[in-house]
Design a protein with these regions (language model features):
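Glycine- and Gly-Pro-enriched alpha-helical subdomains that act as flexible
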Residues: 95-109
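Catalytic beta/alpha-barrel core
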Residues: 5, 93-99, 121-125, 146
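N-terminal binding-site loop/beta-alpha segment at the start of enzyme catalytic domains
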Residues: 1-8
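Short, well-ordered alpha-helical microsegments
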Residues: 10-12, 102-106, 128-132, 153
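Active-site gating/metal-coordination segments in enzymes
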Residues: 8-93, 138-141, 146-151
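Active-site-adjacent C-terminal substructures of enzyme catalytic domains
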Residues: 57, 112-201
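Short, glycine/acidic-enriched loop or turn micro-motifs at the edges of active sites
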Residues: 32, 64, 100, 126, ...
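Single conserved hydrophobic/aromatic residue that forms the stacking wall/gate
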Residues: 199-209
């Protein structure tokens, strides 16, 4: 289980959970919603320091959110790039949040990849196929939440079906987005089995993998 950091000023909380539980790790980052409020949202050294812990396994949640626009877009982008730099230096994957910002997300990932390779995942994917394709082309993973099981998610289901099996991940986004048939309940890691079953049917994929 990975508990996600969304602010540097509160990274001690996911860190404490990871320190207290052998099956929990954490990420360190600034969510795009918080990019305008966090003084160190664009400070690479601050991310390097926050992630300097044996239980930290990723940078993020970072990225762009143009749906709510809680932070200025240029500030979101600057913070995203700073976190990519930290991820590259630490050789940790970056967890990417993308909402209504597909082109800018892909452009930044491709531009930063030209400065030096780094690893990452498009978290809780709900975007257009082109973003998945461009991210996969540079080595990213695409992670699907319980949204994949929703009746309204035909387009996302098609992205999953069209993506290489070795680039697909499944997640909870707990406590939100519980998959069918658990909708309405707090989400939990055990429920990822329902998302996996949707992904593997009707294709002959091995859900155990």
């Amino acid at each position: 289980v990975i508990t996600i950091g969304v602010k540097l000023t509160t990274v001690d909380r996911p860190r404490a959970l990871a320190e207290a539980n052998d099956n929990i790790w954490f990420s360190a980052g600034v969510h795009p919603h918080e990019a305008g409020n966090e003084a160190d949202a664009c400070n690479v050294d601050a991310f390097l320091s926050a992630a300097d812990h044996p239980r930290c396994v990723a940078i993020g949640e970072a990225g762009l959110d143009y749906h709510y626009d809680y932070a200025p877009r240029d500030r979101q982008a600057e913070s995203f790039r700073a976190q990519i730099t930290a991820a590259r230096e630490l050789d940790l994957p970056i967890i990417v949040h993308a909402r209504e910002a597909d082109n800018d997300i892909a452009d930044i990932i491709e531009d930063e990849m030209g400065k030096g390779t780094f690893r990452g995942v498009l978290h809780c994917f709900s975007s257009r196929p082109e973003l998945a394709r461009r991210a996969i082309d540079v080595g990213f993973y695409v992670s699907f939440s319980g949204i994949l099981t929703f009746k309204s998610a035909a387009a996302i289901q098609q992205v999953a079906a069209d993506s290489p099996e070795d680039r697909i991940l499944v997640e909870t986004d707990a406590p939100y987005l519980a998959p069918v048939p658990m909708r309405g309940k707090p989400n939990e890691p055990a429920y990822t089995s329902h998302t996996c079953l949707l992904y593997t049917s009707p294709s002959p994929r091995d859900v155990s993998r």
